[in-house]
Design a protein with these regions (language model features):
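Non-catalytic C-terminal accessory region of glycerolipid acyltransferases
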Residues: 24-134
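Catalytic core of membrane glycerolipid acyltransferases/transacylases, capturing the structured
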Residues: 1-20
């Protein structure tokens, strides 16, 4: 499976929602590295959505790392990326990746993480609706 091999090549952290202690440890480690300038990709849905170009609810807790690190949040809209993994084909597949306007700490510092999650979700959802050609 391609994604599994890609994840082996990069340092990635998987949250085990059933193990709170391990999750807190990962949050602390990633926050420390983010404060030091390392960039991370975080999937705030907590799991993969199998519906074409639709999103699940974002988990507010996934934004705790950015708030603790006072880091900018760059929403990214993935359109048709499911085709790469779900079509079981080696044919050329077109997908879209849209990097949206960063949300800086000063803009979200007084917001609750659930509100940040909704803001980011809504921005990505709007981009998908505007650009989804399917």
């Amino acid at each position: 499976f391609v994604l599994k091999n890609v994840l082996k090549m990069i340092e990635f952290f998987a949250m085990d929602r059933s193990n709170l202690r391990a999750s807190v440890k990962i949050i602390r480690q990633v926050t420390k590295e983010m404060k030091a300038g390392r960039n991370f990709v975080i999937f705030p849905e907590g799991t993969r959505c199998r519906k074409q170009n639709q999103m699940l609810e974002f988990k507010g807790g996934t934004f705790k790392i950015a708030t603790k690190a006072k880091a900018p949040i760059v929403p990214v809209a993935l359109i048709d990326c499911y085709k790469v993994f779900d079509n079981n084909t080696i044919r050329k597949t077109t997908a879209q990746i849209h990097y949206l306007k960063p949300i800086y700490y000063e803009e979200y510092k007084d917001m609750h993480t659930n509100d940040i999650a909704k803001l980011v979700h809504d921005q990505i959802e709007e981009c998908i609706k505007k650009n989804d050609k399917g």
